[in-house]
Amino acid sequence: MLAEPETWVAIAFLLLMGVFAYVGVHRTVLSALDRRSARIKNELDDARRLKDEAAKLLADYKARHASAEREAQDIIASARAEAERIAAEAKAKMEDFVARRTKSAEGKIASAEAQAIADVRAAAADAAVAAASSILSNSVKGQLADELLVQGVSEVRSKLN
């Protein structure tokens, strides 16, 4: 049995393990493994924390984006309403302006028409007075003619004006 190499390998292995146990290599290996385990645990905790922070930041970004989108829609709606109000106000002002200008033009036309009628009547009265004067002066002579002429002229003027 001592002549077999496997036996010597087993004895050497047991002696080596005994020396390692005596020197305390197992404690060094275990403490190194414990440190590595703690470092990996810390890295995993950091990764979880970073993941949670990223999720919070993403949720915050999405909320701010939605808020900005709503605010933009509100601004657009308010701008449309303001534009419609301004357009309606401008239309009302334009209609009021056109109505006032039309009324003013109609007033000027009526005034011009009344003035034209008055001018025509005055011209007709002057023509009638001239015709009456001519007829009376040709047919009647003297003081009677002058009295009739003044009376006729005043009657014609009062009736035509």
From Swiss-Prot:
The answer, when asked if Metal-binding is one of the entry's keywords, is: no
GO cellular component assignments: plasma membrane; proton-transporting ATP synthase complex
Q: How does it sit in the membrane?
A: Single-pass membrane protein
Looking at the UniProt entry, the stretches that span the membrane are 5-25
This protein's UniProt keywords = ATP synthesis, Cell inner membrane, Cell membrane, CF(0), Hydrogen ion transport, Ion transport, Membrane, Transmembrane, Transmembrane helix, Transport
- Self-association state and partner proteins as the record states: F-type ATPases have 2 components, F(1) - the catalytic core - and F(0) - the membrane proton channel. F(1) has five subunits: alpha(3), beta(3), gamma(1), delta(1), epsilon(1). F(0) has three main subunits: a(1), b(2) and c(10-14). The alpha and beta chains form an alternating ring which encloses part of the gamma chain. F(1) is attached to F(0) by a central stalk formed by the gamma and epsilon chains, while a peripheral stalk is formed by the delta and b chains.
Its protein name is: ATP synthase subunit b 1
UniProt lists the gene as atpF1
